Structure formats: structure tokens, C-alpha cells
């Protein structure tokens, strides 16, 4: 029982060390470049797809009615 408790205690300090770093908010230039894709940080592939698709979405102009 004591061994399992020690393992859990050893994992917690590592997680606590990573969290305290404050995240700097993205600048207006970065928001204009990447838009909502800045919130996607879990999967780098998904993030790159959103960054690559974003300029195409902006450049698309619907035909006037």
C-alpha cells in the first residue's frame, strides 16, 4: 500500500511544475493570422490543418446576389 501511495505522490509535483507558467494571450496580429485555431493546442496535426485552411476561408468571396 505504501509503495502505491509514493508513486502517486511522485507524479503530482511534475504536473504542478508544468501548470504555474502563465499563458500569454495571443496578440491581435496572431489572432488575425490564425483566428480560432489558436485555441487548438492538443493535436498539432489538427492545429496545422486549421492554420492552413484559415486563409482560404478568408479569401473566399461569395458571389453578390
Swiss-Prot record:
It comes from the Viruses. Residues 11-21 have a biased composition (Basic and acidic residues). Keywords: Early protein. The keyword DNA damage does not apply. InterPro entries: Poxvirus_F8 (IPR008726). Residues 1-10 have a biased composition (Basic residues). Induction: Expressed in the early phase of the viral replicative cycle. The keyword Cell membrane does not apply. Residues 1-29 are annotated as: Disordered. Belongs to the orthopoxvirus OPG052 family. This is Protein OPG052. It comes from Vaccinia virus (strain Copenhagen) (VACV). The gene is OPG052.
